[in-house]
From Swiss-Prot:
Record keyword RNA-binding present: no
PANTHER family in alphabetical order: EOTAXIN, SMALL INDUCIBLE CYTOKINE A
Glycosylation sites: T94
Protein name per the record: Eotaxin
Species of the source: Macaca mulatta (Rhesus macaque)
Keyword Glycoprotein: yes
Broad class of the protein's primary localization: secreted
PROSITE patterns: SMALL_CYTOKINES_CC
Annotated signal peptide: 1-23
GO biological process: antimicrobial humoral immune response mediated by antimicrobial peptide; chemokine-mediated signaling pathway; eosinophil chemotaxis; inflammatory response; positive regulation of cell migration
């Protein structure tokens, strides 16, 4: 009985000091893009986008979500990417409070 209690205590201590336990509830998983597409995505296939500007990622990127729920990383400096973001912004404006 004493061995199982000690083992349980060690497991709890290990879980408390694991990297996930130390990050706290405010941490959010970071999505990074490691390769960027060079191909222009047709506007009718795009559903939404989000910008990746985290300092934890190797490069800034835009992730487009297609209507088929596929995520595609693109270079935010490219003109077609900027035009696509403007198109999506006009298509679904943010609701006013």
């Amino acid at each position: 009985m004493k061995v199982s209690t000690t083992l349980l205590w060690l497991l709890l201590v290990a879980a408390a000091f694991s990297p996930q336990g130390l990050t706290g509830p405010d941490s959010v998983a970071t999505t990074c893009c490691f390769t960027l597409t060079n191909k222009k995505i047709p506007l009718q296939r795009l559903e939404s986008y989000r910008r990746i500007i985290s300092g934890k990622c190797p490069q800034k990127a835009v992730i487009f979500k297609t209507k088929l729920a596929k995520d595609i990383c693109a270079d935010p400096k490219k003109k077609w990417v900027q035009d696509s973001m403007k198109y999506l912004d006009r298509k679904s404006p943010t609701p006013k409070p």
